[in-house]
Amino acid sequence: MRGVNVLKIILRYIPIAILFLVLAACATAPRQEICPSGTQDLPGCPPLNAIDDAEINEIYEKRTWYPAKDIDEDLIKLGKQAEIPVQHARTKFLGPSPHDAIDSLAVKLWMIENAEHTIDFTYDIFKTDLIGYAMLGAMCEAVWRGVDVRVTIDSAGSISGGTHSALRALGTCADNAGFMRNSEGQLTTKKARVQVVVFNAVSKPSNPNRRSHDKLLVKDGSFEEKSAVITGGRNI
């Protein structure tokens, strides 16, 4: 019964994934929306009731991806110097059994479905099978409701046919993205994005052993009362 319920959830997101793949194949250059200062009741612009929220603005900027050559700060040094607060949290371990694997998948989809502000999704191996498309569909739907999404996938782990094009297609979901909400649930002027990074592309000269083995999904990471993390040995 557990597997049947999870399968129903997976199948619900497959049409969304197929839709954005088709739209991406047909898309021309994206139309740039011109939004006058403030909020305007225009397509692609913040709604009239949106607010300019300082906390969301800061989170938005910190989450923006920049090429390494454009970053002046030593991020490793900053990480070593960072004072990371110890927070109390509940932890649940999922084992290696087939039932645990189904639970792990269900938890991942639940986290994406229930994210209110941000999603960070980073995995070593990502394949465009039934599960992969379900994850992409769920993230696409999240962007539509105003959740800012970041995806990092290792190049070697995602080298299977169609994976990179599917990840690029995920970016088209941002064409109809909603606007982010602050901690009080109010709409802000920041439009949700999809940022996809393929780590250490195999098409570029590099150390073949310099791979990312991260397996991490973070929901609402900057909002303590809403945040959740799943990590471990399972890829997608």
Task: Locate the predicted segments by residue.
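Hydrophobic helical h-region of N-terminal Sec-dependent signal peptides
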Residues: 15-20
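HKD-type phospholipase D/PLD-like phosphodiesterase module
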Residues: 26-27, 31-118, 125-236
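Bacterial N-terminal signal peptides that target proteins for export
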Residues: 4-14
